[in-house]
Amino acid sequence: MNRFSLPRPDARQCVAGLGFSALLLLASSANAAACRAITSVQQSADATRNTSMGGHVTQHIYGMTPPSGSSQKDKTLFKSRGNYDAAWRQYGYIDNPVACSGNSKFQVVSLEKLHMGKIDAYSCKQADGQGVCTRWDTYMAKEISYGFVLKDGKWILNTLYPVPLD
């Protein structure tokens, strides 16, 4: 060994270092909170507050105006605000909610796991000048998609929409 080289770690030190690194990784992912439990997410799940908090759930609820500059055209929509509220409420009861970490998280949940019956939904074909759907096809949803994003330092419910049967 010369004055510029470092001593090489033995196998036990390498294994110990890898084990410690794995433990840190597990601990950090275990500490991530379920998105649905975060106060700012719960606040943003209120469709009337969502747009002002940076989300776009109103882009997926028939009868509500989407955020400025967006449209419901070519989007899937809940048939009513009540269907949207039910989809969010039922997400509170699933046993495997996504944990918020990084910058965004997404989860698709079947209606069966949400303990919801079949729900009618719309596929928007045309919208007015404000982006509100004016012509649609009706379909039966099979799943609900939940999208969470870190916005201005706070987690929010960014999107929530029905997924059609194939």
Model-predicted regions and their roles:
Residues 34, 45-166:
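Functional cores of ribonucleases/endoribonucleases
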Residues 1-10:
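N-terminal secretory signal peptides that target proteins for export/translocation
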Residues 15-26:
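Bacterial N-terminal signal peptides
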Residues 28-32:
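Sec/Tat signal peptide C-region and signal peptidase I cleavage site
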